[in-house]
């Protein structure tokens, strides 16, 4: 008989990718060694971990705090395991990924059919982006 397992493998630190793959490979060989199982595994594609540039992150935090007040800017204490295409950009150029809260007071999960973005948050996002760009050019344009 055959069993197929599928899943997602994500890394907070892309530098650990080879080490994690080796641990998986060693574990599979151990299982094969104590059973009659023949195991084939592959990871055809993995997305990079999203790692913000510290300088860009500070620029965004400073801009957001000046516009919204420090009490309205939350810094995530732990990394997120969510996959994000923005990580590919950060492999090429410095940048920072950040979230703009858009709660309307009703709890609905994103990526569901009843999620409804409160578009009023777009104005806040645009202001933070614009202030970040203004600060960037004030520092780097002189």
Give, region by region, the residue ranges found by the protein language model.
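Metal-dependent amide/peptide-bond hydrolase catalytic core
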Residues: 1-142
């Amino acid at each position: 008989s055959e069993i197929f397992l599928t899943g997602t493998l994500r890394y907070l630190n892309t530098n650990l990718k080879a080490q994690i793959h080796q641990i998986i490979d060693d574990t599979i060989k151990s299982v094969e060694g104590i059973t009659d199982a023949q195991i084939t595994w592959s990871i055809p594609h993995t997305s990079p971990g999203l790692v913000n540039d510290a300088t860009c992150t500070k620029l965004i935090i400073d801009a957001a705090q000046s516009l919204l007040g420090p009490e309205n800017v939350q810094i995530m204490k732990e990394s997120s395991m969510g996959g994000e295409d923005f990580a590919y950009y950060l492999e090429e150029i410095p940048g920072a990924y950040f979230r703009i809260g858009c709660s309307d007071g009703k709890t609905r999960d994103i990526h569901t059919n009843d999620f409804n973005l409160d578009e009023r948050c777009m104005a806040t996002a645009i202001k933070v982006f614009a202030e970040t760009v203004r600060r960037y050019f004030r520092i780097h344009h002189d």
